[in-house]
């Protein structure tokens, strides 16, 4: 268009030098050359761009292949549930119930968010109960299921080892429990004085939220010691971490795998989890430094902080981040399970007040023969009715649907020839074992003294205790895979219940009966909206 315009202009101006008339032709030739050159450049650029895109996509594919867990071959058993779509927890419970009934003694699978889980028949428990971690691994199972790298669910997320905390619980906490009972009792009394009103008349209490804080205080006394265990910022930190970490996991999982690292900056719950770790580092820094000095001099406190430092390798011992996370992880485990177990027991007692007097009579009889200021490690097991009531409550209101969850590390051949391949997730159906008609008489009915009566039979003294494990007692696992903290938890739970039963009458607000438990990922949780009425007992 510019060339035509120039030519017309020249025709109307005859005074212009004639050799200029040839310039538009040369300009046209130059423009054609330039367009041809530009075309070649653009073509080459497009080729480079396409090549760059292909390389980028290939790099992303390689990166994904590196971070994506390698899935084992699909297990040859019926898949009864798919959690990768919208989660229906009621359907999951129904599925596992039906699976246990329809495939009793056989395998079935659940497609969970983190991968396929093979539900094993209980007949294989005996051959798996003693296998070491390098064959059946808990750390890897938890890390994959709870996305620990991003959620900070376990100590592995900051470079530590779960085994360090486990060793502290096994080798120190459990063995010194007898010396800690006085501290546990003192903290239970203190926590009720601080958190429960006088209750001279019937007083409405948000019992579950109160118990979360009571358990945090009592556990903190053993985990970090006074005065930090009563520090409000410390208590808020461990409670908020416990609540936020469970909500954070499904939100992290919603991110594309390669972008999950961004959740730390973009997601409110994940940011809160990391903030809790930063707070714990700040709070624990002087305590950890002081404890290290004491340990070097051959002294030191009797608490989890000191035991974790003692059992740490050099890397863990030198890392404030790891030591702080150990406090968070241990507190989370205690607060989450213990508070719910106590709440369920209180709900069962409030719904069945006929059990209160026999439990009080048992406590009174024990005190008559052992007039101690508090229950010690040797006297606590003598409360057989209380132990039985707790076990029955736990049987019908478990924390989890499944137990003994593990990830297979090395090939394992079972006695029927089935091979469990590396990378596979396994579990046993806890809730269904607890409700098996072949194991329990009238399993759907609550019998608070069921296990006391079973223990009275010859040879059953230890078999049916609250902390007992076995093929028909999966609440705390089995064999080397049993929960190492169950003895501390049991004594803490009983101490709280003894104080409550001894000092208060309680009932539900209104004639509501036993409230239904709620479903959340993993199992039953007591309904947090339920309120309990407390009234202080007048004792002679």
Curated annotation (Swiss-Prot):
It holds the Pfam family p450. Heme binds at residue 483. The gene is ORF5. Its EC number is 1.-.-.-. Pathway: Sesquiterpene biosynthesis. GO terms for cellular component: membrane. Cytochrome P450 monooxygenase; part of the gene cluster that mediates the biosynthesis of PR-toxin, a bicyclic sesquiterpene belonging to the eremophilane class and acting as a mycotoxin. The first step of the pathway is catalyzed by the aristolochene synthase which performs the cyclization of trans,trans-farnesyl diphosphate (FPP) to the bicyclic sesquiterpene aristolochene. Following the formation of aristolochene, the non-oxygenated aristolochene is converted to the trioxygenated intermediate eremofortin B, via 7-epi-neopetasone. It is found in: Membrane. Keywords: Glycoprotein, Heme, Iron, Membrane, Metal-binding, Monooxygenase, Oxidoreductase, Transmembrane, Transmembrane helix. It comes from the Eukaryota. This is Cytochrome P450 monooxygenase ORF5. One of its GO terms (biological process) is mycotoxin biosynthetic process. Belongs to the cytochrome P450 family. The lineage of its organism: Eukaryota, Fungi, Dikarya, Ascomycota, Pezizomycotina. InterPro entries: Cyt_P450 (IPR001128), Cyt_P450_CS (IPR017972), Cyt_P450_E_grp-IV (IPR002403), Cyt_P450_sf (IPR036396). Signal peptide: none annotated. Disruption phenotype: Impairs the production of PR-toxin as well as of the intermediate eremofortin A, but accumulates eremofortin B. GO terms for molecular function: heme binding; iron ion binding; monooxygenase activity; oxidoreductase activity, acting on paired donors, with incorporation or reduction of molecular oxygen. Its cofactor is heme. The keyword Membrane applies. Gene3D superfamilies: Cytochrome P450.
